[in-house]
Amino acid sequence: MAVSKLWSVTSRLGQVIDYAANPEKTAADIYTEEQYQALRDVLSHAKDEEKTECEFFVEGINCNPATARDQFVSVKKAYGKDDGIQAYHGYLSFKEQDISPELAQKIGMEFANEVWGKRFQVVVTTHLNTKHLHCHYVINSVSFVDGKRLWGDEKAWFKFRLVADRLCEKYGLYYNPNPNRSKQSSYYYKQEQA
């Protein structure tokens, strides 16, 4: 089951992006030392050695993760909205089970594309440093398409949950199709509106 959360970032945009893309959290050793040597021998002319040693799970949607901060700021300045909320930071965490970093990142990218990809710049990373693999999202608070701000509310959270549940089902991961999280009628009303 995937769990999601989203919160606003009002300062230090660069630090949030750096945290999400932290190499110590997003790198996976994919080869043994023996395999490294074989790769070095075979691919020494074609590949940079550092790039064959590990894989990083850091991608961008409508932006380059390496320059995302500058790209986010450029969009804000272009629309005169460089104050207030700078970005949103969120995560999608997976139940401890057999999920590979590759699949977590794939689901994370699909999730971000569906929820924000048509209008917003998003940095998507998968952190591998805990028992529960989890994707981090840093979303520009201003749309590059129309300059409108991203607003997070409880209704949006239900949409996130529905998208996450559908993707978990699609990839054969556990999800709870009928969570009884609250007995309040407003909870169900907001769910229906999502």
Regions found by a protein language model. Name each.
Residues 1-194:
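N-terminal nicking endonuclease/strand-transfer module with a His-rich metal-binding environment
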